[in-house]
Amino acid sequence: MSIAYDLLLSILIYLPAFVANGSGPFIKRGTPIDFGKNFVDGRRLFGDGKTFEGLIVALTFGTTVGVIISKFFTAEWTLISFLESLFAMIGDMIGAFIKRRLGIPRGGRVLGLDQLDFVLGASLILVLMRVNITWYQFLFICGLAFFLHQGTNYVAYLLKIKNVPW
């Protein structure tokens, strides 16, 4: 196979994670996953931006993408996409946890972490499930995530979906 084919395939493989990660901002309010609890440092675990409702929407949208992908590949892509979406959201929550420990409020910016936390979470489960991803596919997805995150967040800001352009 060609490198171009491999890069296009990597987009398809990571599409559930991208969709899951991008669906969260559409939920404006909800029950915080951390139930408003603080960590031992007195700061919130994740903050109000990580909600059960957002998680459900992310899992639903990401898994729906997997159902569509499974029509072209194998039925196991439904399960893979559910787990990929879940781990992408876990990666996103770990990113929020790290930001709270650093004293960065919800909506605060940490270049790199904001764009790649969900990719790292999704990559973990994809590797554990033995989905074949090459190093250049992974690097391509990281670069794509970095630039797409910047662009889509700016558009979401212009559309008043997000409060900040990052």
UniProtKB/Swiss-Prot annotation:
- Membrane topology summary: Multi-pass membrane protein
- Origin, by domain of life? Archaea
Give the primary localization class: membrane
Its EC number(s): 2.7.7.67
First-level EC class: transferase
The residue ranges crossing the membrane are: 7-27, 55-75, 78-98, 116-136, 138-158
Sum up the protein's function in the record's words: Catalyzes the formation of CDP-2,3-bis-(O-geranylgeranyl)-sn-glycerol (CDP-archaeol) from 2,3-bis-(O-geranylgeranyl)-sn-glycerol 1-phosphate (DGGGP) and CTP. This reaction is the third ether-bond-formation step in the biosynthesis of archaeal membrane lipids.
| Name assigned to this protein | CDP-archaeol synthase
In the UniProt record, what gene is named as encoding this protein?
carS
